[in-house]
Amino acid sequence: MRKETKENSVNLVEALGEGQWALRWDFKPKLNEQGEETGVNWYEEEVFLHIPQIDEIKEAVTNWQNRQTDAAILQGFRWQDMMVWLSMENQFNYKSVFDLASMTGQAIAAWDAEHPDLAGQEFVLRDVTTEEGTTLTVPVPTGRPREVLPVTFKFGTDEEPQYHEFFTLEELTEFYTSCMSYIQGCYQSGWTKKDSFDYTIYEELLKGM
């Protein structure tokens, strides 16, 4: 749980009374919108009903770090100045559309190369004579694979939605690879924070308890 204090430091492991013990980490200054210190410090705290052991400390901190990474992935990505919510559902939808558009694009290119006289045409007009002898001009499918694009995605928030229509595979590819690059960057940042977290200070504290 995120807490605030005007103190310049906190006890990382502290008895609260009634058998409760506080575990604290991520102590840092609270900043305003301009990035200036406010005189208040933030820290994370989890309360135990016993002295937390080092494996419990690692589990609590790791779970928090995972939540931080998940939150950054969910709501931290912006594309062309639009907020993109990267929920698991949205990630799946973006991947499905990208994969289908990529495969279809290759199939269309191959079909057009084999049928240069019909390239770019999903239908052609043909004259058909009915049983009554009437001639009708109707569209007839050529067999060319159907285009996936254009496709529209909803970005922004429910209160301020923004819609973007993708007309080309190149733009869709740029969007999707940007999403994947951002997600991978979030994971790498999370791994770095996990690897650099110093648990030795907690181990030393526990020795004296």
What is the meaning of each model-derived region?
Residues 2-209:
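A preference for well-ordered globular domain cores
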